[in-house]
Amino acid sequence: MSVEAMVQTMIDDLTAALGDAVKHDKGNAAAGTRVRKAMQAAKTAAQDVRTKVQADKNA
């Protein structure tokens, strides 16, 4: 997968999490759990992008 595609996937996933963020702001605790899960997935995806960029640089 290209770095561009990886970043676009992250953007799409974070955009999808916006609905739960709004619900969390209105007091929905379960939505907060979903937001935290999405943020953890974004963190993992960001690390994957960093690893790929570094590997491409060193290749």
Predicted regions and their residues:
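N-terminal acidic leader/helix
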Residues: M1-D20
